[in-house]
């Protein structure tokens, strides 16, 4: 019970849905439902917990759409000829698969979903600094997704998720314009959300919480938000200029009219390589919370892991040109960005070392969350090793635009980011819903996902080394066998989503009741009731 001036707030803990919190103001009693109703999640709600769940559910729906596009592409690539999809439709699927997975699945779920739900709870704040701005940031995402889907009615954007001109200027201009507008909306959402996170973490944490007590997830979100604020406006500027070239007769990037396509690449990659860290830094934060809890051992090297997030934020702004080693980059620039690319691996290695040291000697519980965390360690190290090879200009020149790049990218972002999102869902599901997920279905989900990931993406390294170009619907028949293996793996990945979806829905509706702190975790969000109602106290 809390008393402040003439207000009395009575909040029953661990009560079943339907109970009410009683607020007495100036002698008048007001009754408020303790639990949110299902329809509250479809409204312009300013509660950070509701917004976090809105992000997670919406992002997962887009994940299913992007996954269907991926399975369709892999079905096409099972044979050398374009006998299933029209090549133009294949290009549209390829473009929008990448766009949806990056901008509407990983970024919204990792930052918007977990960040909004957890950050205020972890730092002891009542809500985000700007609740209405927070809601606006979320509601910019669904229209962006609808614009991307609507682009298929106009031929679909076919220039890849990078939208390089001049290709993006000559294929399906209406669809390309819709695609640009969608990314600008998502970018605006990212800027608003990042500003909110920075203010919340810096100025709204409880005064008694010292900086060396701030949860590592919050350090990761802080670094991610600063990086997004510095890089996202640059992408928005480049895309707006591209939109002008498409619709208003300008020639910023038209080579035949004096435009410079390399300038676009600089503008795009100044954001889009830091975007990789936007997608993986929050996952690093999730790992730093999940591993010590399920290893039942304090995190090893707290300060090193916290500061390494900030180091990645800084160094990550100076590595973008390694995507442009084949774009006529001068030798001195190749040398500088090769070195900076290798340097960024150092703070990442600090995190890996800290997690492995935490596991060493721990009393590990092989829960679904822990299995995905350990799987992420293996997948990300694999992706990191291939990334170090591509960071060196002499090697990158040979494998650029081959399937070697596709393999590396997916080991980092699927084996890294998606595994981490799954780990976070299994870990915080009891706090979000008040229910436990089924561990048997969770382990089946992990096994299928782990096998499918390696079967899909491991052979792509060999395909790239043999010279198979990426982003093609037809290929030389000599690559058929390895592509068949990749397609089988993609089918397994598609099937792996089924037990997870069943598990999440069934557990949310009728799963085993969870206690306030089923994992015996130590961060502040676990001191509230499960699920957290409209009002909560620590």
Features from the language model and the residues they span:
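...captures the hydrophobic TM-helix bundle architecture rather than a specific catalytic motif
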Residues: 3-538
């Amino acid at each position: 019970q809390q008393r402040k001036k003439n207000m009395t707030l009575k909040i029953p803990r661990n009560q079943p849905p339907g109970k009410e919190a009683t607020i007495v103001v100036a002698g008048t009693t007001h009754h408020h439902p303790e639990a949110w109703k299902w329809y509250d999640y479809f409204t312009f709600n300013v509660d950070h917990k509701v917004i976090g769940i809105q992000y997670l559910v919406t992002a997962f729906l887009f994940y299913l759409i992007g996954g269907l596009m991926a399975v369709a592409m892999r079905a096409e690539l099972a044979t050398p000829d374009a006998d299933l999809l029209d090549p133009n439709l294949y290009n549209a699927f390829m473009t929008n698969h990448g766009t949806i997975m990056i901008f509407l699945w990983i970024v919204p779920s990792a930052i918007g979903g977990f960040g909004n739900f957890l950050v205020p709870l972890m730092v002891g704040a009542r809500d985000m600094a700007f609740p209405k701005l927070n809601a606006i940031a979320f509601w910019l995402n669904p229209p962006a997704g609808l614009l991307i889907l609507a682009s298929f009615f106009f031929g679909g954007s076919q220039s890849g998720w990078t939208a390089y001109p001049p290709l993006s200027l000559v294929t399906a201009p209406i669809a390309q314009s819709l695609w640009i507008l969608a990314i600008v909306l998502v970018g605006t959402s990212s800027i608003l959300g990042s500003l909110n996170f920075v203010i919340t973490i810096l100025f709204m944490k409880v005064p008694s919480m010292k900086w060396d007590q701030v949860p590592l997830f919050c350090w990761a979100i802080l670094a991610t938000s600063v990086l997004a604020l510095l890089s996202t406006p640059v992408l928005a500027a480049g895309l707006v200029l591209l939109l002008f070239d498409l619709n208003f007769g300008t020639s910023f990037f038209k080579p035949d009219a004096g435009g410079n396509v390399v300038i676009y690449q600089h503008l795009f990659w100044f954001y889009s390589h830091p975007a990789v860290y936007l997608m993986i830094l929050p996952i690093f934060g999730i790992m730093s919370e999940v591993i010590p809890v399920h290893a039942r051992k304090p995190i090893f090297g707290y300060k090193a892991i916290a500061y390494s997030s900030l180091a990645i934020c800084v160094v990550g702004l100076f590595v973008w040109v390694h995507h442009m080693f084949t774009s006529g980059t001068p030798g001195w620039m190749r040398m500088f960005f090769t070195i900076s690319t290798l340097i960024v691996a150092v703070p990442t290695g600090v995190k890996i070392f800290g997690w492995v040291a935490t596991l060493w000697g721990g009393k590990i519980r092989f829960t679904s969350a822990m299995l995905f965390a350990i799987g992420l360690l293996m997948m990300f190290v694999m992706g990191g090793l291939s990334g170090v090879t591509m960071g060196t200009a002499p090697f990158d020149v040979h494998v650029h635009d081959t399937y070697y790049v596709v393999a590396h990218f997916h080991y980092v972002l699927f084996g890294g980011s998606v595994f981490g999102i799954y780990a976070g869902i299994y870990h915080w599901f009891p706090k979000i819903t008040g229910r436990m997920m089924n561990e048997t279905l969770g382990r089946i989900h992990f096994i299928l996902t782990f096998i499918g990931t390696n079967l899909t993406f491991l052979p792509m390294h060999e395909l790239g080394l043999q010279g198979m170009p990426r982003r093609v619907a037809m290929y030389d028949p000599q690559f058929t066998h390895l592509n068949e293996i990749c397609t089988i793996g993609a089918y397994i990945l598609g099937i792996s989503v089924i037990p997870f979806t069943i598990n999440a829905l069934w557990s949310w509706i009728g799963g085993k009741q969870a206690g306030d702190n089923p994992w015996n975790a130590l961060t502040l969000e676990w001191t509230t009731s499960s699920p957290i109602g409209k009002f909560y106290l620590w």
